[in-house]
C-alpha cells in the first residue's frame, strides 16, 4: 500500500559515505560513459543509479517517473488500460502475483505464479516493475505477447493478451442461501470500504442477515484506509492496525468507527496465497479481535507500507517506510495470515497452491528476523 507524503524538512543525518565509495561510483560512472557499447547520457545514468538504489532495497521501493506516478494513481482509482495483473519478482524475472478479476489477463488464461520471461521478445530478467509496466501498458485493443514459464510445464510458451480498460468494480455481493451473504472484494480502491457498507445495507433491506462470507482471495491489496473503513462494518470501534518504522511520522494507529452494521452476525473471511497487504489487514484485525473465522490457505505476507515522496513536479520515490501490525502486535511481513481453518483448495479459481508467489519468494524480501525497529528518531529516512 502506498501513501503520499511531503519530504520531511528536518535535518537529515550526516552522510557517512567514504571518499573511496564515492570514488567507486565516479569511476563506474566514467567507465560506462567511455566504454559502454551504446551512447548513454549522463541524465540516463543518474536515473539508472537512483532506480538501482531503490529496487535493491526491497521489491516494493521504486523510482516513479511521471508515467509511473500516473499509473499508481490510476490503480487506486480503479481504472486503467493494460493487462490486469499484479506483479512481483521470482528468480530475477517478473512474475504474476495475481490476475485481476474480469481482466484481459484472466481471459488470456494467465495464472498467479506464472513467470513472465519475455515481453514482446524482450527479456524481463533484471527488469524493474516500472519498466515492465511501460512494456505491458498501451492503447486499448492493442496486443502484447508474453513468454510464460509455469510450474508443471516443461517448456515456456507464448500468451497473446489484448490490452483493455481495467474498470472492474472492487466489490460484488450475492445471497448464497436464506440470509447468508457472500461479499467478494477483488482489490482495495478508494471507495471499496463504502461499497461494502452499501452491500451490507442492501442485504439488510432484503431481510435478516444470518451470516457473511467476506472473500478476499486473490486480492492484492491497495488503499489501506479502505481496509480500515471496511473493518468498521464488522467492529464497534477499536484498533484495526498500527504501523511502525524508523521515523516518528511512520508511527500511526488506525481505528474502526463505532457502530458496526452486523453486531453478533457470524463472519467468515476467505484468504489464500494471493491475499496481500490491505486484505491481510482486515483479516488480521477481525482474527485478532475475535470477530471472524479466517478460512483458506496462508496469505501472501506483505506487511510493509510504502510512502510516495515527490522529488520534482513529475517524479517521485516510492519508499518502504514502515511495517504494519495487527491489533495483537503481529507483523505479517513475509509470514502472512495463518487461517483458523485451513482449507487447501479454498480457491477462487483452479489455481494450484504450489504455483503461488508469496512475499517471502520476492527478491530482497524484508526478512522479519533482520529488521530492528529502533527507538523513534527525529532524523528523516
Report the location of each language-model feature.
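PDZ/PDZ-like peptide-tail recognition elements
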Residues: 48, 60-98
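Conserved P-loop NTPase
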Residues: 306-309, 315-352
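Cleft-lining beta-strand/loop regions that shape enzyme active-site pockets
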Residues: 14-21, 33-42, 95-98, 103-112, ...
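Glycine-rich phosphate/pyrophosphate-binding loop
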Residues: 354, 360-370
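Single conserved hydrophobic/aromatic residue that forms the stacking wall/gate
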Residues: 371-381
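N-terminal activation segment of mature serine protease catalytic domains
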Residues: 10-61
Amino acid at each position: 500500500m502506498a501513501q503520499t507524503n511531503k519530504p520531511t524538512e528536518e535535518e537529515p543525518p550526516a552522510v557517512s559515505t567514504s571518499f573511496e565509495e564515492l570514488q567507486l561510483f565516479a569511476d563506474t560512472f566514467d567507465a560506462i560513459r567511455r566504454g559502454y557499447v551504446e551512447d548513454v547520457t549522463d541524465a540516463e545514468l543518474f536515473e539508472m543509479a537512483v532506480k538501482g538504489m531503490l529496487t535493491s532495497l526491497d521489491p516494493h521501493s521504486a523510482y516513479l517517473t511521471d508515467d509511473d506516478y500516473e499509473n499508481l494513481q490510476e490503480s487506486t482509482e480503479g481504472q486503467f488500460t493494460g493487462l490486469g495483473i499484479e506483479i512481483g519478482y521470482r528468480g530475477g524475472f517478473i512474475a504474476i502475483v495475481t490476475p485481476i478479476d474480469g481482466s484481459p489477463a484472466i481471459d488470456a488464461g494467465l495464472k498467479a505464479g506464472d513467470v513472465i520471461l519475455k515481453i514482446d521478445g524482450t527479456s524481463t530478467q533484471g527488469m524493474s516493475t516500472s519498466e515492465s509496466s511501460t512494456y505491458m501498458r498501451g492503447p486499448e485493443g492493442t496486443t502484447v505477447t508474453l513468454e510464460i514459464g509455469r510450474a508443471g510445464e516443461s517448456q515456456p510458451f507464448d500468451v497473446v493478451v489484448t490490452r483493455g480498460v481495467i474498470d472492474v468494480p472492487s466489490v460484488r455481493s450475492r445471497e448464497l442461501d436464506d440470509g447468508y451473504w457472500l461479499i467478494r472484494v477483488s482489490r482495495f480502491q478508494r471507495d471499496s470500504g463504502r461499497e461494502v457498507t452499501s452491500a451490507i445495507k442492501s442485504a439488510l433491506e432484503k431481510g435478516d442477515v444470518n451470516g457473511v462470507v467476506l472473500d478476499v482471495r486473490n486480492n492484492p491489496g491497495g488503499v489501506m484506509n479502505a481496509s480500515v473503513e471496511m473493518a468498521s462494518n464488522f467492529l464497534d470501534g477499536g484498533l484495526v492496525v498500527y504501523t511502525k518504522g524508523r521515523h516518528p511520522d511512520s508511527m500511526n494507529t488506525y481505528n474502526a468507527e463505532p457502530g458496526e452494521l452486523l453486531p453478533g452476525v457470524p463472519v467468515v473471511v476467505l484468504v489464500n496465497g494471493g491475499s496481500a497487504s490491505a486484505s491481510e489487514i482486515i483479516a488480521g484485525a477481525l482474527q485478532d479481535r475475535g470477530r471472524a473465522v479466517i478460512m483458506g490457505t496462508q496469505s501472501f505476507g506483505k506487511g510493509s507500507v510504502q510512502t510516495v515522496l515527490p522529488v520534482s513536479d513529475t517524479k517521485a520515490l516510492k519508499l518502504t517506510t514502515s511495517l504494519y501490525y495487527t491489533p495483537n502486535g503481529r507483523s505479517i511481513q513475509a509470514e502472512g495470515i495463518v487461517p483458523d481453518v485451513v482449507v487447501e483448495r479454498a480457491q477462487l479459481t483452479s489455481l494450484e497452491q504450489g504455483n503461488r508467489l508469496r512475499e517471502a519468494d520476492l527478491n530482497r524480501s524484508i526478512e522479519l528476523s533482520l529488521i530492528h525497529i529502533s527507538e523513534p528518531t527525529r532524523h528523516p529516512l
